[in-house]
UniProtKB/Swiss-Prot annotation:
Enzyme class: isomerase
Protein name: Glutamate racemase
Assigned protein family: Belongs to the aspartate/glutamate racemases family.
GO MF term list: glutamate racemase activity
Reactions that this protein is recorded to catalyse: L-glutamate = D-glutamate
Gene (UniProt): murI
Length: 262
């Protein structure tokens, strides 16, 4: 199984996969050279995704791909499925689930600008805005804050307040928030403290849904596990990567190495 993202957000998916499928082996591709995907063009996102899968597929016998990134999923998933002959799973903003949960009919969606602007997201926003008020924040800054948190940098309350100011100033805030980026679940506590100090809020991500799909695929198809160890690949060696290494110990990678994607 290959799981890839431009940052560590995808590790939240990997963590949940490990809970449900503890015996599975995996490759995690950290495309930190391209971080963040959220400020890249659709052309770049599509070409980069093809390059990652093609390059790793030539070296390792991967049989499932998990795109641990809302931006790539909303922009490129259909193209990737056409191009490769293995199951490919993506993660998407789960507005349908939010509609079932919201009490005040005000739903918040926070995602990267590329995810918000994608035709997929625009379509579902239009579909569900008929019966709900959907408040949107498109930002590439929150993923950067989450990455820094993983490396031990304190989360700036001032920066968070600036990002969420459009919602802070609302007479009634969303009671249900869709986390449209795998990084954002790392900041749930901080987001709640900024917006809802005395009230409850329900956060929605799509991790459970994609894990259910993966589990079903493994049960119902002839997908056999061919990778025999856990591998961590990265596209750029820098100081941020070095600070991340201690955090990676919990995932029990037996191989950590650079891979050239250029």
């Amino acid at each position: 199984m290959l799981i890839f993202d431009s940052g560590v957000g995808g590790l939240s998916i990997l963590k949940n996969i490990k809970k449900i499928l503890p015996n599975i082996h995996y490759i995690y591709m950290l495309d930190n050279e391209s971080f963040p995907y959220g400020n890249k063009t659709e052309f770049f996102i599509i070409q980069r995704s093809i390059k990652i899968i093609h390059t790793i597929k030539k070296i390792y016998p991967i049989n499932i791909v998990v795109i641990a990134c809302n931006t790539i999923s909303t922009v490129a998933l259909s193209i990737l499925r056409e191009k490769f002959d293995i199951p490919i799973f993506g993660i998407f903003p789960h507005i349908k689930a939010a509609e079932k949960i919201t009490k005040n009919k005000i739903i918040g969606l926070i995602a990267t600008k590329a995810t918000i602007n994608s035709s997929y997201t625009q379509k579902i926003i239009y579909e569900y805005s008929c019966s709900n008020t959907i408040k949107i924040i498109g930002t590439n800054k929150l993923a950067v804050i989450a990455e820094k948190k993983i490396r031990g940098v304190a989360v700036s309350q001032k920066k968070l307040k600036n990002i969420f100011r459009p919602w802070i100033n609302l007479p009634t805030c969303p009671d249900t928030i869709i986390l449209g980026c795998t990084h954002f679940s790392l900041l749930e506590k901080e987001i709640k403290n900024i917006l809802y100090k005395t009230r409850s809020v329900y956060f929605i991500d799509s991790i459970k849904k994609v894990i259910f799909q993966i589990k079903s695929c493994l049960k119902t198809s002839n997908v056999n596990q061919k990778i025999k160890k856990n591998i961590f690949l990265y596209s750029k060696n820098n100081n941020n990567l070095k600070k991340l290494l201690s955090f990676l110990k919990q995932y029990k990678f037996t191989v950590i190495k650079h891979i050239n994607l250029n």
